[in-house]
């Protein structure tokens, strides 16, 4: 969703019920940055490149797939920016991706888009690569004050802004009643975690959950583009 304050949606998402190469379940959210159309181009190019790499890959190892696809995507976005500096100089994107394989979720993250696990509680799996998060972790800022910090949108890592990229990786065992949320900061900056949990836990209709999350973020101001992917884990243990 474009939100209430932006004229263009610079977020891109990927989800599918079909296999992507050797991967049965792949989900991605990317939040682009850059002037004019550059943010949209960065997020879209990153997802297209990453999914292309995974689709054509022969390895089945989820961590290897995430690492190599992100390197490939970073190279594509960075070289595109260099090829057209007038339109694309400095463009980049956040990138959070999840592969779910046989009860285990493998997550990669760059920037401040997030992945949560939701059940009776809500747990943020990723760690924001942002100035505010660094201040909080260094004890220089209280977390509650961080939500309204004037520099909360400054990120410290992004995909496509240089010839190298440093993602974080996480591996999580999933339970059969878990739900997974991938989202851009247009959602997580506008809605408290507990309310996100209540909305997702309050319905089994995943499309309805996404609509309610986006509506609520817009209700609170819709200051940025809003993207959400909600996944239900429903296998027999």
Predicted feature descriptions by range:
Residues 1-237:
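PP2C/PPM-type serine/threonine phosphatase catalytic domain
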